[in-house]
């Protein structure tokens, strides 16, 4: 998809690649939903569940990072962000997501999957809150990115 900003040369954004990653993001959020209740007792008795949660959260982070890098580099004309946390700020500057979502998906304490790793060892009862925040954040991310793609359709100028 070719888009342009006022006064800027058109840039190319690979809409199909973004949409493909969004499909995987949606599936990963559904996988988190399917795990059900994630209380401390369950995580202590079933360590595999904690590992699965951490892996799905890492996948969500990686996919969003790839989308954010691609769109921000194309739209902003800057070097792509080097970290997932920085990529959410760049995605916000590119108009892909709003500032509130950018902040929610780049927690100050670290990425959701890293927080889960730490909490599994020390405070497993905190895992559910981290997963809930990530699940709602990535669900909203999919919604906003889908909206951006729709608004940036080939027949529309961004």
Language-model segments: residues:
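Solvent-exposed interaction patches of small proteins and small membrane subunits
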Residues: 1-158
């Amino acid at each position: 998809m070719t888009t342009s900003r006022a006064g800027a040369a058109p840039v190319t954004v690979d809409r199909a690649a973004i949409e493909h990653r969004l499909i995987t993001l949606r599936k990963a959020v559904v996988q988190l939903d399917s795990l059900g209740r994630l209380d401390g007792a369950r995580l202590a008795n079933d360590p595999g569940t904690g590992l699965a949660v951490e892996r799905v959260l890492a996948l969500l982070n990686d996919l969003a990072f790839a989308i954010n890098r691609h769109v921000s580099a194309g739209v902003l004309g800057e070097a792509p962000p080097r970290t997932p946390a920085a990529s959410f700020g760049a995605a916000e500057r590119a108009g892909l997501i709003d500032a509130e979502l950018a902040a929610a998906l780049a927690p100050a304490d670290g990425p959701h999957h890293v927080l889960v790793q730490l909490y599994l060892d020390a405070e497993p009862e905190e895992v559910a809150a981290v997963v809930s925040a990530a699940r709602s954040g990535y669900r909203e991310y999919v919604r906003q990115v889908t909206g951006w793609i729709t608004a940036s359709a080939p027949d529309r100028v961004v």
